[in-house]
Amino acid sequence: MELGKGKLLRTGLNALHQAVHPIHGLAWTDGNQVVLTDLRLHSGEVKFGDSKVIGQFECVCGLSWAPPVADDTPVLLAVQHEKHVTVWQLCPSPMESSKWLTSQTCEIRGSLPILPQGCVWHPKCAILTVLTAQDVSIFPNVHSDDSQVKADINTQGRIHCACWTQDGLRLVVAVGSSLHSYIWDSAQKTLHRCSSCLVFDVDSHVCSITATVDSQVAIATELPLDKICGLNASETFNIPPNSKDMTPYALPVIGEVRSMDKEATDSETNSEVSVSSSYLEPLDLTHIHFNQHKSEGNSLICLRKKDYLTGTGQDSSHLVLVTFKKAVTMTRKVTIPGILVPDLIAFNLKAHVVAVASNTCNIILIYSVIPSSVPNIQQIRLENTERPKGICFLTDQLLLILVGKQKLTDTTFLPSSKSDQYAISLIVREIMLEEEPSITSGESQTTYSTFSAPLNKANRKKLIESLSPDFCHQNKGLLLTVNTSSQNGRPGRTLIKEIQSPLSSICDGSIALDAEPVTQPASLPRHSSTPDHTSTLEPPRLPQRKNLQSEKETYQLSKEVEILSRNLVEMQRCLSELTNRLHNGKKSSSVYPLSQDLPYVHIIYQKPYYLGPVVEKRAVLLCDGKLRLSTVQQTFGLSLIEMLHDSHWILLSADSEGFIPLTFTATQEIIIRDGSLSRSDVFRDSFSHSPGAVSSLKVFTGLAAPSLDTTGCCNHVDGMA
């Protein structure tokens, strides 16, 4: 559904957080107007109704509904402006039942700007929490006044986000890379710090947070670019420890059991601060020493790099589940590939799935957080110019996405404002997570302790590369790595380079991620009497991955047989042509065109989905407007070829001379695919592309394909693609 154009924040925004009301529908803004759009679920489908403007302001940054408490109480809507928040109540009109009267109940002003997700309602009552970069204020009486209760934030860090737990007893505030917990006393209307879990550090800055079940929260941490850049800048130096503290560095371990009680708070916090500060402090070059080994006796200066991040999992953004009970426990931690700053997060309580996205990336990832199963992932990919500006679950299977489409701008200069103009629309995507075989409770904890070992970074890379030789050349993404040493020992590899991301599943379905263990009982059963560092256990039940591997091997074998058969057919054709020429005499050679007027066609090959959503394009020379079928077969490694004409796929054949019995025109675009594979299992339903941007071709369901009048190919022109 198209909503029109509007001015939205570039980053940090989730315009659909607490924006859907069961009666009044969706509240959204274009930057100035407050609009209500009717939203209904009918037979499992979303139906959008009429929209009406209920207010207009100079600047609106966000909207959020208070939780519905009772039928006889007015409905509250918080309107977030740049530096203040106004709370409005909606009451039914006594004159017309279809109309609603709005009136302002209170206005909250502050000296600092409100954070992009700075209005958070209590899950069970009309208590509003307002966040700035330095303050957290709770307003328990928004129906009548602006009386507030301030949280005691005794830290110098910057507040990013906050949320209430589902039980409504605890407020969790993300300050920098740490979580601060507060207990709410509803009777006294007071907020005090939790004595059993004061501060819990998660190693990286928290971008977004949401409540999951009971006293558990899910947080998304950004990629620690400051640590990686700090490491890369000093990678050739061996920096000694601080002279004041000669103890070895305390390096965090991702798979380590992370828990915090009252006694261990100070010691654990101090040990990790010493690590993070080593990447942020300026380097003292006057104390740089070099180590000289026996094998380096002839070297003048030997400087050794110290890599603290590679292999620890800190070179990626993460989704972390944190449980607050008697002690804080990190119950699970998985990587978020391809997204640098995951500032959008949403949770569905019924399906136990989390959606993670970013305002600056067109990818949305769906994770399963069920404790007894391996977390799955589903990828939702938007257009290149589209960005998710808000996400929320309507049901356990439907995800509502507010999409902002940006016009193409010059990326040479950084944007000068925090907001930009977008073409706003609403889309609904179905969540289809494949269920993994259930794991018993006795096996689940053991699974967490062993699953990260076989699926660490190196093994996962080998597994992905084994699926297809071209798998790493498919979906574009960003990979940031701090491992800058090559096999020949020369440092200096690019820190950030564009690769083809392996994050998408082979069939846009679900693949199992590596779950890094964080909580284990003290008495876990041993699978072997050998030490831990020598035991290697297989990952638990990966039928989909094994099926894909066997399917890939079968596909490669069949392709090799087809190539041999095609070569034999080509040899027979050449022998037959030579025989005919000997009997009938040489044919007069045709006049060839000038190289300046090169006649060629663009052949676009749509590959099967389990090789990745990839479109390969080649430029092929025409011979008198004709294409030789064998040339096309050899170019793309196909035995049977289907060509798209209007909305139909047509199998191509050859005449007695080996040419496709059609005439083609220069610079014509031809779309082909493998004709020997099953349509229902392998290919998408349809194919669409833009005439001016063939490089951004993608496959979509239900879109009509462009028409072609002719096709053909002969000698291949290298370098034209």
From Swiss-Prot:
Residue ranges of region Disordered? 520-553
What terms describe the molecular function in GO for this protein?
kinase binding
Q: Which InterPro entries match?
A: WDCP
What GO biological process, any one, is recorded here?
A: protein complex oligomerization
Q: What does the UniProt keyword field contain? A: Acetylation, Chromosomal rearrangement, Coiled coil, Phosphoprotein, Repeat, WD repeat
Which post-translational modifications are recorded for this protein? Answer: Phosphorylated on Tyr when associated with HCK.
Q: Where are the WD repeats?
A: 55-98, 154-194
Q: Enumerate the Pfam families for this protein.
A: WDCP
Phosphoserine, modified sites? S299, S468, S501, S523, S686, S690
Q: Annotated region Interaction with HCK: where? A: 539-545
Compositionally biased tracts (Polar residues): 520-537
Q: Which residues carry this modification: Phosphothreonine?
A: T530
Q: Which residues carry this modification: N-acetylmethionine?
A: M1
Q: Which residues form a coiled coil?
A: 556-584
**At the top level of its lineage, which domain of life is listed?**
Eukaryota
- Entry's disease: A chromosomal aberration involving WDCP is found in one subject with colorectal cancer. Translocation t(2;2)(p23.3;p23.1). A 5 million base pair tandem duplication generates an in-frame WDCP-ALK gene fusion.
Note the subunit structure. Oligomer. Interacts with HCK (via SH3 domain).
Q: Can you say what this protein is called?
A: WD repeat and coiled-coil-containing protein
**Primary gene name:** WDCP
